[in-house]
Amino acid sequence: MTKILLLTITFYKYFISPLLGNNCIFSPTCSEYAQEAIITHGIIKGLWLTFRRIIKCQPFCIGGYDNVPTSIKNSKQPTKKI
């Protein structure tokens, strides 16, 4: 299941995202964040972190550097401006 999910994100990253333009206000991009979150924390926690990240990726958020937390307890760390 994890491989299928990661392949889906990779497909989006290379084939769909370029058509939509580079709109992500974060570094790493949301798709890179999703891949890292799923690899680091597994499917359930990784998808939860990805969901929270995508909700923040909108024009009213400052954006900046927002790396995947090393543990879920640290997931409320503030985003750093770049």
From Swiss-Prot:
Span of the signal peptide: none
Transmembrane portions of the chain: none
Subcellular locations according to the entry: Cell inner membrane
Entry keyword Cell membrane: yes
Bilayer disposition of the protein: Peripheral membrane protein
Listed GO CC annotations: plasma membrane
Keywords: Cell inner membrane, Cell membrane, Membrane
Major site of localization recorded for this protein: membrane
Family membership noted in the UniProt record: Belongs to the UPF0161 family.
Function: Could be involved in insertion of integral membrane proteins into the membrane.
Name of the featured protein: Putative membrane protein insertion efficiency factor
Organism, scientific name: Rickettsia typhi (strain ATCC VR-144 / Wilmington)
